[in-house]
C-alpha cells in the first residue's frame, strides 16, 4: 500500500481521477505537474483522494514538509511507481491494439 506518515499519522496516497480533479479545482487550471507548487498541491490531492475524512489542511502539510522533507521523497517515490505502472499498462494496450489490427 502507498502511504506517507505526517505528524505520526499514516495517510494513504492515491493517484486517481479524483486526485486529478481535486488538483484542477484547487489550482484552477488543467492537470499538469510543471512546478514545485503543482507537485506539492498534487501530493495534497493524493492524500485527500485516499483519506476523505482527513483534517489535514494544505497549510499543515506545508508546515510538515518544512519540518520533515522526507515526506516529499516518499511522494516522489510513489509518483515514480505510479508513472511506471501507467507506462506498463499503456504498453500492453498498444501491443494489444497491434495484435487486434493483424486479425
Residue ranges and their predicted role:
Residues 2-7, 18-21, 25-34, 49-103:
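Charged interaction scaffolds used for protein-protein
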Residues 11-13:
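Short, isolated positions in well-ordered beta-strands
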Residues 37:
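Histidine-centered catalytic/metal-coordination loop motif
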Residues 40-41:
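Extended, low-complexity alpha-biased scaffolding regions
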